[in-house]
Amino acid sequence: ELLYEHGIGAGDPVAIYSSSTPHWPLAFFTATAFGRVSVPILRDFSGIEAEHVLKHSESRVLFVGKQQLSRLSEECLSSLDLVFDIDSLEIIRSNAGGKINKERHEPQPNDLAALIYTSGTTGQAKGVMLTHINFVTNVIAGFYIHTIGPKDTLLSILPLAHTYELSLGMLYPFASGAKVCYISKAPTPSYLVKVMANV
């Protein structure tokens, strides 16, 4: 509702620049609801890299972690309509004008769902366009690869801005009812041994 009140509707890009947390999927589903487009940004991108993605994608909204927020310039933040703290899901910055309600749009299979930017090993990061049917196909493929269900618990290690982790580490468990745990540190072998003992 809040995004609609600020005129953020179908086709509008909504970026997520954060570590993987339980609120990351909430931001993703908020972004893709009613035809909006999710723009996941790798958590380790520098401020310059993240600002390139925000500008290139023409993102209007940003869900951001505290660590990542500190990397962004004032000029970048002032170009966004809304900035949310991903941990509290509260607006921490609003540059939007008057409230304008946009008509709701139910996403169609071939509508753009996400713009996922590569790490840019041969230059600046480039956006890969993925539709809703791309993600649905990946989730269905997951059931053929390895069936999981409500009694299963998965440990999310890769950043959710990676296509693989987004598809098979978040959307597939969500569709199957499985539980997902997120790590708060780098996945070193010693840390993973401790985490696995508690999952």
Which positions does each model-derived feature cover?
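Conserved pre-ATP/AMP-binding loop-to-beta segment of ANL
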Residues: 99-117, 124, 147-153
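Conserved adenylate-forming
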Residues: 47, 55, 78-87, 184-199
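Conserved AMP-binding A3 loop
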Residues: 113-137
